[in-house]
Amino acid sequence: MKALVIAATVCACGGKPAPRVSTTTLVVHVTDQAKAVAARVMLVDATGAPVHIGTLDVYKTRQGGGACAIAPGVIGSWDGLVLGYGVAEVPVGVDACTPSPAIPYGHYKVVAWRGIEYDRWEGEVDLSADRGRVELAIPLHHAWTPHGTMAADLHVHAFASDDSKMPNQQRVIAQASMGIAVIGLSDHNTAGDLTAEIHELHLDDVVTSISSDELTSDTLHLGVYPVRRGSGPPASKIWHANVDQVFQIAHSFPGNPIVQVNHPRFRVTALYDQAGWDGVSWPPPFPLAFDAVEVLAGYTAFNIPSDRRFDDSVRDYYTLVDHGHLVTPMGNSDTHDFTWVLDGSARNYVYVDDARTNPFDEAAFIAAIRARRVVATTGPWLDVEIAPKRGATPTAGPGQLVTADAGGVWVDLRVERAGFVKLDRIRITIGGEHGPELAQTIDVPPDVPSFGWHGRIEVGHADTWIGVTTDGDTPLPLEQTGWYQREKWKHPGVTPFAIASPILVDADGDGRWKRGDADIAVPKR
């Protein structure tokens, strides 16, 4: 890479401006088993402060369009470098960013990460002046691998949202750096996708995009996907539409898209809160015309003693399932910028037969969401398999059905986590005689990367379901999740939580699952 040159001083040759030249270049190589991977790299100076790059341009509190394209495929953001390819040559001391220099000459601590599947890497680098090319190798360690899934963030904002303004290419790089494979671009009342930007960045083999639209009204937000780019009514017909009208608009899109309720416990523009639902009474005071709901939503991604927002969201969701309203539990970031809520801070792992992004089997991916084949998480991996009895095959996973054996089933669980994710418990909930009931709480030993549990769970002889969650009370690192919880609400931060889509149990063995409004044939496997 050629040295960056910027006119600054005056030389002795005729009084012409002399160029300022960066005399040190940071050459980064982030790898997973020697293969370059997109990632984030934060530099921390001698005072312990992170190097902030760019400006806070959205309401003077958030960074949307104020980041700096500091090098090809590299975004200089408020919390560090965002590397789209894992390999980069970044100028130090002199650059075209505002303010400049983005990275002053000096000695830095380095922290690198790639979403939640990898352990953090920490080291040091000397970027003093006149050091030339400074090589920095960052080998990341995969803490866990979600086999047979695609990581998806299906509620994401970019340039077309007036409260984001992040350039679309930067959104692609940001998502790729956090290990997301499927992006649902869901700008407010705008149907769009990121396919063109992904192709321009040559990231087709890494990430793909689904065209989505977040229908945004005063009372609720609905995600609709996949939709045709540029389709949908004008925003003026949606802003002040009532709940019934917004659902009607959602179902007017051709092709029977997924209708997803976004952040229903956000307190504002939140369906459950606006309707005054307590999460238990039935029927709820709103239409049930949706396929999926954000149980883990980026702006409400926490449990604290005074506000167990995750637990409330799971309670709401289990009430729906218990009455036979089988919708998919989703986890999406709702990211708007580079500061408040970050890409993939809540995400989905969708079980698919073909996990490639190029080509991408969109129809199969959407079918998997509709079939509830999802684990949603803000940090840990949660594997759930259920069989009629110990050793029986095949087993049932998230969203599937199993037949009980003499009023019980055999449950195999495993939680895995990166080192920065602290877990405390696993909870198993079943549909009881009078509604959802906690069947078992299992303590997770501290500081173990992988923990398994198995045992028989009694379910009785009426058709039911089994839901499993895992969570912890220690917040995740703010630089990895964003600063919204602390800056806006003075909360410690995002806490780790995962939910597997419940497994249905044919307890009476009649070949059908009947509970509430549902009557479903148990497929032969």
Question: Model features per residue range: what roles?
Answer:
Residues 1-7:
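Sec-dependent signal peptide recognition
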Residues 14-16:
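Bacterial signal peptide processing site
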Residues 10-12:
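C-terminal motif of bacterial Sec signal peptides marking the signal peptidase cleavage site
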Residues 184, 294-297, 504:
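Residues embedded in well-ordered beta-strands within globular domains across many folds
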Residues 54-74, 223, 227-235, 272-303, ...:
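Active-site gating loops and adjacent loop-to-helix segments of metal-dependent hydrolytic enzymes
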Residues 20-21, 29-98, 104-139, 143-144, ...:
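C-terminal functional module detector
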Residues 120, 128, 141-279, 305, ...:
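A metal-dependent hydrolase metal-coordination microenvironment
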